């Protein structure tokens, strides 16, 4: 605003200059605030017609940034889960190969393989308890607690399978296979090696799977559970419906074998069932891991696209909320000069007015 510098000796001109000075001071205060924080206004009402657009764009930006963070946060736990599944698959594949050659001819090999299977079962339990930070990545909604909370070797599942295999000569292969399947399938307290949260039917457990929101109406599963399949169903005639339980069952069965059973009727049938079940479990496990890998790639790509969207929205918000700093600083300097001129003019007018009164 240009200050009216016309010189008149009446009180009207003096009042006008005082009013102009007040306007300039308000302008200076606004420009000083804008130069300090870079914002058009520190209140929504100060944005005038741009207030509605700022609110809408700000809400959209917050949502997009949240979805981007969700996608980024899911990456670490998913990678840890992938690593655990990959190692379990390798263990299962090793014993799949060993059971193909396991027979009653080489009794010593039976004891060696059994000891290795017991160690492998402990290793699998440890992998199921893999953590990313403080999160158990295969525990789903119960991520603060270990999926396999206790020593798996003393679980009812393992001791039950061991007892059934030990009774192979009396019960026969079919009954033994049925008993090991029942023990591995059980969610009963004291039998299931899994936590209470994960010792539930697979249909119930689907609600425990971790998922992340990456869009207004888009949630993507971001993990798997230790005790239940995710997207790929287990197949075959000898399965619990869970490839992890099937792997555990196989390792517990192999671990319970002994060289003294080499000539027992039903030994070959039990080993063959274990071999077949392991193969089916490996296929389902690798299938689920593959689906999760694809989702990881999807989340990575979405994270990038959400970042681009956030950048674009930030630019639009900035257009409304932020000042052009170079222009603001230039106006600030000019307004300071204008205010100084106003003070000088006011002083001159007051002196003239006083002189008029005294000389009147």
Region locations from a protein language model:
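Polar, low-complexity export/assembly segments characteristic of proteins
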Residues: 17, 21, 28, 32-35, ...
